[in-house]
Amino acid sequence: MKALCLLLLPVLGLLVSSKTLCSMEEAINERIQEVAGSLIFRAISSIGLECQSVTSRGDLATCPRGFAVTGCTCGSACGSWDVRAETTCHCQCAGMDWTGARCCRVQP
């Protein structure tokens, strides 16, 4: 019985120690994540966003060339609107007095 216990001790030691060691694949994956995260952060941090608001009388408000709609607002307490062709806000209620669009574009 003592001999069996002595034989099992090295096996148990290997099982325990193998869990604490980092495998080569894990180390490589961690390094790839670090480098990729750094590159992505640098790329994103250099991008700017330019936004402006446009307001028009009636039920349509169109963004300037190169800008896209990011949000719409309507007068007369109307909450129903849609975006047309990615550049124009359309308020769907009858008799709209004004329509607003928030327009943005990416700046490198």
Swiss-Prot record:
Hormone that seems to suppress insulin ability to stimulate glucose uptake into adipose cells. Potentially links obesity to diabetes. Promotes chemotaxis in myeloid cells. Its main location: secreted. Belongs to the resistin/FIZZ family. Expressed in white adipose tissue (at protein level). Widely expressed, with particularly strong expression in lung, bone marrow, breast and peripheral blood. Expressed strongly in bone marrow and at lower levels in lung, but not detected in other tissues. Isoform 2 is detected in adipose tissue, bone marrow, brain, lung, peripheral blood, placenta and thymus. PANTHER family: RESISTIN (PTHR21101:SF11). GO terms for cellular component: azurophil granule lumen; extracellular exosome; extracellular region; extracellular space; specific granule lumen. The keyword Transcription does not apply. It holds the Pfam family Resistin. One of its GO terms (biological process) is response to mechanical stimulus. Disulfide bonds join C51-C104, C63-C103, C72-C89, C74-C91, C78-C93. GO terms for molecular function: hormone activity. It is found in: Secreted. The keyword Metal-binding does not apply. Homodimer; disulfide-linked. Interacts with DEFA1. Residues 1-18 form the signal peptide. InterPro entries: RELM, Resistin-like_sf. Keywords: Diabetes mellitus, Disulfide bond, Hormone, Obesity, Secreted, Signal. This is Resistin.
